[in-house]
Amino acid sequence: MVALLRGSEIEVKAVEWLWKPMIPFGDVTIVQGDGGDRKTTMMLTIAAKLSKGILPPSLEDGLLVDAPTIAPASTIYLTTENKAGSVTVPKFEKAGGDKDFIFFNNELEQHMTLTKEELTEAIDITSYRD
């Protein structure tokens, strides 16, 4: 059975941004693009900065605005394309990341096998936020 909610049943909350207006805190973010677009490099650079408590600048009214610093935070980086040991960890290190603040899936498959419950648990385990 499909579970549906009316809009009137949903509590509206303000978005807390990791990178305004691109990436919200605490949500799954999927990046798609052509090979060679530097998706991995961009996301691992953001994760590396986040591991040091540095947020990317926000885009507000067409201008880049410096974001405040925060406590170092974790990233769960899931991929079906790159191996952690040969691609993602070296790129994360090159960007200056603290390896204690990044977590990777332990499998390289075409399809993710994490259930919603497993992903929620992973976020809870690695989260520094309430």
Identify the residue ranges that each predicted region occupies.
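Short hydrophobic/aromatic beta-strand immediately N-terminal to the Walker A/P-loop
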Residues: 29-32, 76
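N-terminal pre-Walker A segment at the start of P-loop NTPase domains
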Residues: 1-18
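Hydrophobic positions on the alpha1 helix immediately C-terminal to the Walker A/P-loop
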Residues: 42, 46
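Conserved glycine(s) of the Walker
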Residues: 38-39
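Gly/Ala-rich phosphate-binding loop of Rossmann-like dinucleotide-binding domains
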Residues: 51
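Residues immediately N-terminal to the Walker A/P-loop in ABC ATPase nucleotide-binding domains
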Residues: 24
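Conserved inter-motif catalytic segment of the P-loop NTP-binding fold
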Residues: 14, 18-20, 55-130
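The conserved Walker
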Residues: 35
